[in-house]
């Protein structure tokens, strides 16, 4: 995202660079340095174009990727692809020769597209983080909206419109509003490049606000996961506690006349390890349920039906297991099994959300590292009119900004199982193991 005249390493002002270019001089690079820089720039172009093209092709090859949240990743890939296919190639001869040779019309188009793509890339990062924030903090309503692709398309279009409005009108109309162009012949940069007030306002909307937003979203996701983890652990401790749940606690003891038969039956129902998993649970619950004085029907209704018979007392757990009518213990057992199932579901969702948080943290961190140097140097450079920031530091900062477009496609397969599967399907189909779609665990989904 070139935002300044590409001054030579020894020339701090655009005028001196313009004079050197007008005299036919290059930027002062030796032949060896020119070859090295050209090779590095070509490598960045290839990596950016191929990486993001692979992401876009993955959406064509794998229909499982076409979910609402993944459309936002596609939008980001489109922005990054165009950066590598259009913006960087036009800048390479400019930076190597120090002179723009493509005319004023293409210069305007290049500036509009360059600012548009880089700004939309930042806004897409915000949209992706916001989408994951909703998926974690408002899971029910979020899942209900997953089939509404029109909503996703509207959000994607809004990103492009806002990105254009931030810089596009200023690039196209600044010279007419100011009464003429101040750009020297043979150069291509925005008219407002040294307008500190405009740049601080635009930078606030382009970087500082998005960065604070994604930091807030990811911090909220992290705190939500921590809270749910504590709740799950507390629930597990309560379920494994020495006391049974309230609905399974015994009723007051039966009348003294049958105390002995109840005590014996209950005692024989206690050794859970003698039964299988299902039988042990039923047996244990059954012994407790008989205290309710009528949990179901005839054979298991009440301890008073046996007036002290020891043999009847020993048969009680077996009759409970084979009873034809459900007792209160059956409902309690079903509730416990449901709690176990919910615990596994919650554990899976927590694991998935942790992956989401980690992957977003990586993307956001790289976003900050790539954008912060450029934004800060641009503001400082505008404040001192280009005299307080060495040229090579500034150029390094916006090459770092462009490098973000090459890095983003690498991040997707590292955190997303379906992207890895789609990439394998495209690049190494013979290594793709046939798996049912239901077994895929998504990092983003």
UniProtKB/Swiss-Prot annotation:
This protein's record includes keyword Disulfide bond: yes
Annotated tissue distribution: Expressed predominantly in the CNS, with the greatest expression in the thalamus and caudate nucleus. The various isoforms are mainly coexpressed in brain, but their relative expression level varies in a region-specific manner. Isoform 3 and isoform 7 are highly expressed in the thalamus, caudate nucleus and cerebellum while isoform 5 and isoform 6 show a poor expression. Isoform 5 and isoform 6 show a high expression in the amygdala, substantia nigra, cerebral cortex and hypothalamus. Isoform 7 is not found in hypothalamus or substantia nigra.
GO cellular component: dendrite; plasma membrane; presynapse; synapse
Disulfide bonds: 107-188
Compartments reported by the entry: Cell membrane
Membrane-topology annotation of the record: Multi-pass membrane protein
Record topological domains on the Cytoplasmic side: 61-70, 130-156, 218-359, 417-445
InterPro entries: GPCR_Rhodpsn, GPCR_Rhodpsn_7TM, Histamine_H3_rcpt
Transmembrane portions of the chain: 40-60, 71-91, 109-129, 157-177, 197-217, 360-380, 396-416
Signal peptide segment: none
Name of the featured protein: Histamine H3 receptor
Organism (species): Homo sapiens
Organismal lineage: Eukaryota, Metazoa, Chordata, Craniata, Vertebrata
Gene field: HRH3
């Amino acid at each position: 995202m070139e935002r300044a005249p590409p001054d030579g390493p020894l020339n701090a002002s655009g005028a001196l660079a313009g004079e050197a270019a007008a005299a036919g001089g290059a930027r002062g690079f030796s032949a060896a340095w020119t070859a090295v820089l050209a090779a590095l720039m070509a490598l960045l172009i290839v990596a950016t174009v191929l990486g993001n093209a692979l992401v876009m092709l993955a959406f064509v090859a794998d229909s499982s990727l076409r979910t609402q949240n993944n459309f936002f990743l596609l939008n980001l890939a489109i922005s990054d692809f165009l950066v590598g296919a259009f913006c960087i190639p036009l800048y390479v001869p400019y930076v190597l020769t120090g002179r723009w040779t493509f005319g004023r019309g293409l210069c305007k188009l290049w500036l509009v597209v360059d600012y548009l793509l880089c700004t939309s890339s930042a806004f897409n990062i915000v949209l992706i983080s916001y989408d994951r924030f909703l998926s974690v903090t408002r899971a029910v309503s979020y899942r209900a909206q997953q089939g509404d692709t029109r909503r996703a398309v509207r959000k994607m279009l809004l990103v492009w419109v806002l990105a254009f409005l931030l810089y596009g009108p200023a690039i196209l109309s600044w010279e007419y509003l100011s009464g003429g162009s101040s750009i020297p012949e043979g150069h291509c940069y925005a008219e407002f490049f040294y307008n500190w007030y405009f740049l601080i306002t635009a930078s606030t909307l382009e970087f500082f606000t998005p960065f604070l937003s994604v930091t807030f979203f990811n911090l909220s996701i992290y705190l939500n996961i921590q809270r749910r983890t504590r709740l799950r652990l507390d629930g597990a401790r309560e379920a494994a506690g020495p006391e049974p749940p309230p609905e399974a606690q015994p009723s007051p003891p039966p009348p003294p006349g049958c105390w002995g038969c109840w005590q014996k039956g209950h005692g024989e129902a206690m050794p859970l390890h003698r039964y299988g998993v299902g039988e042990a649970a039923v047996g244990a619950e059954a012994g407790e349920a008989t205290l309710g004085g009528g949990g179901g029907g005839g054979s298991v209704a009440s301890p008073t039906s046996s007036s002290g018979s020891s043999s009847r007392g020993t048969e009680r757990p077996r009759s409970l297991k084979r009873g034809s009518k459900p007792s209160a213990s059956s409902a309690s057992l079903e509730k416990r099994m449901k709690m176990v199932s919910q615990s596994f579901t919650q554990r899976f969702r927590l694991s998935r959300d942790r992956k989401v948080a980690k992957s977003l943290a990586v993307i956001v961190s790289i976003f900050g590292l790539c954008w912060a140097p450029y934004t800060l140097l641009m503001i400082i450079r505008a404040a001192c009119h280009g005299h307080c920031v060495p040229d090579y530091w500034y150029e390094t900062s916006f090459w770092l900004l462009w490098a973000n477009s090459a890095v983003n496609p690498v991040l997707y397969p590292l955190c997303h199982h379906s992207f890895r599967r789609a990439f394998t399907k495209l690049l190494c189909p013979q290594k793709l193991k046939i798996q049912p779609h239901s077994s895929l665990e998504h990092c983003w989904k």
